[in-house]
């Protein structure tokens, strides 16, 4: 799994600051550009990037937001869920906020789905006028295309494959071997996420550059 990097004191409170920012903007209709900005802010201030492989330390980031991560058996069409409040603290060793990942996911799939579920906490819980502190919250990550899932997908894309770094490594891969299969495999291993996710990121960046 991820190598943990210690934060400098200057950045230790970035997570609490982001939480406060989102609470102050409850009810805001976030654009996908807003989501990108939040993902970039987290990456910039937390310095939560593995220096050897440069993959985002998404487990570390999630835990810094005070969310514990567990694995459980679930139905195959559910990738995970997030639970806050209710009996969560009693069931999960004193943790009031947990993300549960389907234990049939591989490690790279876990990274993508963890990032998406973290976005549920940030934008569907903290940023919602319908949620109050410590109120029970539960949401499943299913294979459906609700508005929050568009936001979740945007957040995962930006935090796991930062655009500048992604373009840089795409160019590195192409110089080594410009065959499509090689580029996909190179980037998938570099960022430690599934090739399907890489395909979409490449297509998105190429479309925006035309």
Language model: regions and residue ranges:
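Active-site hotspot residues in diverse enzymes, especially metal/ion-binding acidic/histidine motifs
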Residues: 1-210
């Amino acid at each position: 799994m991820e190598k943990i990097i210690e934060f400098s004191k200057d950045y230790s409170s970035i997570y609490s600051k982001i939480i406060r920012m989102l609470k102050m903007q409850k009810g805001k209709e976030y654009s996908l550009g807003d989501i990108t900005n939040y993902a970039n802010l987290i990456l910039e201030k937390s310095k939560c990037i593995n220096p050897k492989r440069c993959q985002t330390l998404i487990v570390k980031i999630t835990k810094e937001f005070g969310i514990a991560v567990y694995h459980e058996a679930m139905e195959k069409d559910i990738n995970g869920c997030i639970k806050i409040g209710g009996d969560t603290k009693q069931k999960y060793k004193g943790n009031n906020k947990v993300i549960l990942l389907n234990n049939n996911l591989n490690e790279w799939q876990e990274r993508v789905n963890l990032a998406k579920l973290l976005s549920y906490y940030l934008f569907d819980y903290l940023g919602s006028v319908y949620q109050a502190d410590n109120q029970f919250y539960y949401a499943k990550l299913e294979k459906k295309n609700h508005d929050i899932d568009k936001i979740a997908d945007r957040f995962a894309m930006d935090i796991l494959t930062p655009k500048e770094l992604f373009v840089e490594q795409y160019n590195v891969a192409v110089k080594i071997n410009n065959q499509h299969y090689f580029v996909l495999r190179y980037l998938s291993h570099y960022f430690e996420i599934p090739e399907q996710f890489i395909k979409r990121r490449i297509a998105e960046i190429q479309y925006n550059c035309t």
